[in-house]
UniProtKB/Swiss-Prot annotation:
It holds the Pfam family IspA. InterPro entries: YciB. Signal peptide: none annotated. PANTHER family: INNER MEMBRANE-SPANNING PROTEIN YCIB (PTHR36917:SF1), INTRACELLULAR SEPTATION PROTEIN A-RELATED (PTHR36917). The gene is yciB. This is Inner membrane-spanning protein YciB. Keywords: Cell inner membrane, Cell membrane, Membrane, Transmembrane, Transmembrane helix. Plays a role in cell envelope biogenesis, maintenance of cell envelope integrity and membrane homeostasis. Its main location: membrane. It is a multi-pass membrane protein. It is found in: Cell inner membrane. Belongs to the YciB family.
């Protein structure tokens, strides 16, 4: 459910982006609605509304949600202020690389890896598995950032499609692969499960 709520602003961005630009009358002012700049404005507004509602209802936002919201406000505002979509194209790469940096930093700062802080309350795994899992997330975020950057500046007609559905597809595939990997190791840290020799 949380992932769906986080996806709402991006989905609205995609819908508005795909609209044919049309002129609408708003309080006597003619505005063009549709295309990248209208979509960016919708992304900013919907992000503030969605994360604002979450903050009001839960009295907090997760760090990842704060990062996503701030990045949306910064890169979205720059896109509108300078009327250049280049700024927005950098949003996904920068956010992904900052996530990767956070996972990398947890190898050197703190007493637990970031992935263990996130999932440790629900899973019991050997330390080597936690380490491999944390590294896998680092690689995933680095790859997603690079893929978004490559598509944004190489295939400009498709970068919004990739931003929404390509990134979602990569995330789903990674989570499925992670689930398969974890299913092989969940018993390793369970003392009630007898170990078998290969």
């Amino acid at each position: 459910m949380k992932q769906f709520i986080d996806f709402i602003p991006l989905l609205l961005f995609f819908i508005v982006y795909k609209l044919d630009p049309r002129v609408i009358d708003l309080a006597g002012h003619e505005l063009t609605f549709g295309g990248i700049y209208s979509a960016t404005a919708v992304l900013i507004i919907s992000s503030v509304v969605v994360y604002g509602a979450i903050f009001i209802s839960q009295r907090k936002l997760e760090k990842s949600q704060w990062l996503t919201l701030v990045a949306c406000l910064v890169f979205g505002s720059l896109t509108l202020a300078f009327h250049s979509e280049t700024f927005l194209k950098w949003k996904a790469p920068v956010v992904n690389w900052l996530f990767a940096l956070a996972f990398i930093g947890s190898h050197f700062i703190g007493d637990r890896l970031l992935i263990k802080r996130i999932m440790g309350h629900a899973l019991t795994l050997p330390e080597p598995v936690w380490t491999r899992l944390n590294v896998a997330w680092i690689v995933f975020f680095l790859f997603c950032g690079a893929a978004n950057l490559f598509v944004a500046f190489t295939f400009q007609d498709y970068w919004v499609d990739f931003k929404v559905f390509g990134s979602l597809g990569m995330t789903v595939l990674f989570l499925v692969a992670q689930g398969i990997y974890l299913s092989r190791h969940l018993h390793d840290a369970d003392p009630t499960t007898p170990k078998t020799e290969d």
